[in-house]
Amino acid sequence: MIVVDNHSSDGTTELLAQMAEADTRLVHLIPERNDLCIGGCWNLAVHHELCGEFAVQLDSDDVYSGPDTLAKIVAAFREQKCAMVVGTYQMTDFQMNPIPPGVIDHKEWTEGNGRNNALRINGLGAPRAFWTPLLRKLDLPNTSYGEVYARGLRISREYRIGRIYDGLYCCRRWEGNSDAALEIEKVNANNLYKDRVRTWELEARIALNRK
């Protein structure tokens, strides 16, 4: 497990250092730069020499739904022959109790609808997993919103994205969580960013089709 500790000030750094010393399977990375957003932290981890063939998301507040989550994701890569896999998640409170809107599976996004259907939804789902050699060529944008969505659209332009509709991930929300109750201005800014990402991707696909 690679943990990018983006200059934490709440005791996380000290705790991770102790854990990494006790278990070498935990790789504790602290960026040299101070300007990295979530996308930049992804890039730091993916380019690390100990990053394996597949890079799988695990946000700091969230948990995999079972001990077989990673095995299911790797199996999906092998069986579906894809460059990225997106699973299904359950919204919960911090005590793991289900909360609305419940299960998020994006069943409207199917292979039968075609890869362009990803342009019509406002998110790809979770957890997200990548084939590392490709992701190293397509760094995520250094943002803290929509960074994986942007890269997922770029990947789906040329490569298959596999889907898993079984629940793999618990997305936990706690009171005061930055994603739980955003101001309308922030919601609008986030939506504008994704609109721009979709526009850029649509233009790129049109240009590709004209070649």
Model features per residue range: what roles?
Residues 32-50:
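Glycine-rich, basic loop-to-helix element that forms the pyrophosphate-binding segment
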